[in-house]
Amino acid sequence: MSRERISAQQTETTAAEQEQELTLAASHVVSDVSEVDDLLDEIDGLLAENAEDFVTGFVQKGGE
């Protein structure tokens, strides 16, 4: 009977740990998405100002 209790406690701990890991992973995903959105907003702003300079700079950097 004591083995059943230990096993049940380990399962509960494992489930709690998994939930914490998933929560942490989800927060990292939200952070990554936010960073990507910021980068895309910056690119949109540059393209709105002067698309030709942006493309020229991008092509030169990519070609080196």
UniProtKB/Swiss-Prot annotation:
Coiled coil: none annotated. Pfam families: Pup (PF05639). Pathway: Protein degradation; proteasomal Pup-dependent pathway. GO terms for molecular function: proteasome binding; protein tag activity. One of its GO terms (biological process) is modification-dependent protein catabolic process. It comes from the Bacteria. Keywords: Isopeptide bond, Ubl conjugation pathway. Residues 20-58 are annotated as: ARC ATPase binding. There is a cross-link at residue 64 (Isoglutamyl lysine isopeptide (Glu-Lys) (interchain with K-? in acceptor proteins)). InterPro entries: Ubiquitin-like_Pup. Belongs to the prokaryotic ubiquitin-like protein family. Strongly interacts with the proteasome-associated ATPase ARC through a hydrophobic interface; the interacting region of Pup lies in its C-terminal half. There is one Pup binding site per ARC hexamer ring. HAMAP family: Pup (MF_02106). Protein modifier that is covalently attached to lysine residues of substrate proteins, thereby targeting them for proteasomal degradation. The tagging system is termed pupylation. The N-terminal unstructured half of Pup provides a signal required to initiate unfolding and degradation by the proteasome but is not needed for pupylation, while the C-terminal helical half of Pup interacts with ARC to target proteins to the proteasome. This is Prokaryotic ubiquitin-like protein Pup. It comes from Rothia mucilaginosa (strain DY-18) (Stomatococcus mucilaginosus).
